[in-house]
C-alpha cells in the first residue's frame, strides 16, 4: 500500500488540473473521481466519455489503476486523457492510496 500524503502531492501536481475527488465535485477536463473504486470505466454520471472508455468494461480497483496509470493510452487506446502516465510503481502506489482514501468519503 502506498503513502496517502505522498499520493496527495502527486494528485495535486499531476491530476488536479483535470480532476476533482470530492463528493459532488464538478467535472473538469476529466471526470470527478468520487466513487471511482468499484465503478466501471466510462460511468461517472454527467461526463462525456469516448467510446473507448465506455467500452473498456473493466472495474476500477488497485490493480487496474496500477496498470492504467503507467500508460493510459496503451491501456485504453482512444481515451481522451492526455496524460503520459507515471512510470515509477511506488509513485503509482502512493497516488492509488490517496485516491482510494479521497474518493470514498
Swiss-Prot record:
GO molecular function: electron transfer activity; heme binding; metal ion binding
Keywords: Acetylation, Electron transport, Heme, Iron, Metal-binding, Mitochondrion, Respiratory chain, Transport
Secretion signal, residue range per the UniProt entry: none
Gene3D superfamilies: Cytochrome c-like domain
Residues noted as binding heme c in the record, renumbered to the chain: 15, 18-19, 81
Annotated function: Electron carrier protein. The oxidized form of the cytochrome c heme group can accept an electron from the heme group of the cytochrome c1 subunit of cytochrome reductase. Cytochrome c then transfers this electron to the cytochrome oxidase complex, the final protein carrier in the mitochondrial electron-transport chain.
Family label: Belongs to the cytochrome c family.
Protein name: Cytochrome c
Organism: Struthio camelus
Encoding gene (name): CYC
